[in-house]
Amino acid sequence: MNRRLDNDRTIRAPRGRDISAKSWLTEAPLRMLMNNLDPDVAERPSELVVYGGIGRAARDWESFDRITAALRKLEDDETLLIQSGKPVGVFRTHADAPRVLIANSNIVPHWATLDHFNELDRKGLMMYGQMTAGSWIYIGSQGIVQGTYETFVEVGRRHYGGSLAGKWILTAGLGGMGGAQPLAATMAGASMLAVECQPSRIEMRLRTGYLDRQAATLDEALAIMEESAKTKKAISVGLLGNAAEIFPELVRRGVKPDIVTDQTSAHDPINGYLPKGWTLADWEAKRASDPKAVERASKTSMVEHVQAMLDFHAQGIPTLDYGNNIRQMAQDMGLKNAFDFPGFVPAYIRPLFCRGVGPFRWAALSGDPEDIFKTDAKVKELMPDDKHLHNWLDMARERIKFQGLPARICWVGLGDRHRLGLAFNEMVARGELKAPVVIGRDHLDSGSVASPNRETEAMKDGSDAVSDWPLLNALLNCASGATWVSLHHGGGVGIGYSQHAGMVIVADGTPEAAKRIARVLWNDPATGVMRHADAGYDIAIDCARDKGLDLPSLSK
């Protein structure tokens, strides 16, 4: 019996003000857990898989049922502990403590290998939580669309005089994270050709408006890119195929995209990357019968994929790793210069991290889109001079379809997050919003992750692999009063390559919530400024001084 498969269930978060838990502080994690498994949100909800290969919301269906039952009974001075998707304890704490503490996929470093994780996973002792799957704050592809948009815009500034009009981007992967790429590209003014091996993913991105159309052949896709370059009208096109075949073919043809990247689930060579020449049926069967053969074949294919990216890079085409660890996988198979092209964080995003700017997000527990539109307006009111942010919010309202509970992603930093959170809480208190909102973020943030091949790649002081920082971030968020806090391993880049922390706080309109929000939404981004100031980044040092952070190791 497969305890992780239930084709008879359809999970959707409740809407409205009626709650089945004892307070909004426990109703909120209940709804967000359920929202992660909404069919409009999750990739394979019947298997509890939310996104990112096998990133799950709960370890198995029995654990899911026990978590939901525990949340409904939880008192406002109790804390539920989750160990890799399984509820293991309820303890008396206090009203300002987190209601839920989550640890996912954490393994003692010497044993933190994919093989050992898979053994534990098969035994039912662990699950892969990715970043926001197991921490219950995934909001669909919107969750990464602004970060991807900001990256593409910055590429345009650096390489193309500030405009991507008439340019096109080559990428692969249209899963939960990669599915944001086509919309991010067209919002940034560029066209995109996205290669995807699974028809269902292309269909989902078409259905949700993230992808404009599908091409039947590579020739058709290239013709569309050529026409869009002439007209300077941005369009996104999905092509069913394998990137390990399509990317090298484009190199052979002498085709020159304007930007090259990739968001396949290469971090998981068994469950996330289809080997070249294999059918989906072959892949699925072999994953169960001979996972090592799948891993070898996948990594061999990644070598061809990355070599093509290196070839584009050698031609002077901006080429970037978008954080799926594909360079590492190729290097492991003998491609020595796999890291010749950069990751997106050191190349384009780190200056934002130095100021604590990152993927702030919130979701309306009412289920009413109007609550999000009202909060959009409040963000504009409180940040009247940030025209770039206003433009983002306008485009998001016009072009992003909500998946599950209505939500918004909005990159803001230290000094702004707590102001927005307090304003949202006041809107709930005054009845301007129909129900409370939850405020969280991706684990991909300035102070909450150690990932030497992604967020902390090429740190100025060489501290790429120091993972004290996400541990401190999680501990501080617990002490500050976040509603739930998570500490994960392996998200984004795979087992053995990252540690990271998440937090969510509920704005329920109470004065007590306001105090917690003020602490959490100041302290959380401040750890990012602290981390980068400690590494010697002048932007972060200046920000720390400007914001009055007390950093004892920072010279006065």
Swiss-Prot record:
Q: What class of enzyme is it?
A: lyase
Q: Name one GO biological process term.
A: L-histidine catabolic process to glutamate and formate
Q: Which residues form the active site?
A: 410
Q: Where does NAD(+) bind?
A: 52-53, 130, 176-178, 196, 201, 242-243, 263-267, 273-274, 322, 492
* Cellular compartments per GO CC: cytoplasm
Gene3D superfamilies xrefs: Urocanase like domains, Urocanase superfamily
Where does the record say this protein resides?
A: Cytoplasm
Q: Which UniProt keywords apply?
A: Cytoplasm, Histidine metabolism, Lyase, NAD
Recorded superkingdom? Bacteria
Location, primary (coarse class): cytoplasm
Q: Which cofactor does it need?
A: NAD(+)
Record-level Gene Ontology MF annotations:
urocanate hydratase activity
UniProt pathway:
Amino-acid degradation; L-histidine degradation into L-glutamate; N-formimidoyl-L-glutamate from L-histidine: step 2/3
- Give the HAMAP family listed for this entry: HutU (MF_00577)
**Family named by the database record:** Belongs to the urocanase family.
The protein in question is named Urocanate hydratase
Q: State the organism of origin.
A: Bradyrhizobium diazoefficiens (strain JCM 10833 / BCRC 13528 / IAM 13628 / NBRC 14792 / USDA 110)
Q: What is the lineage of its organism?
A: Bacteria, Pseudomonadati, Pseudomonadota, Alphaproteobacteria, Hyphomicrobiales
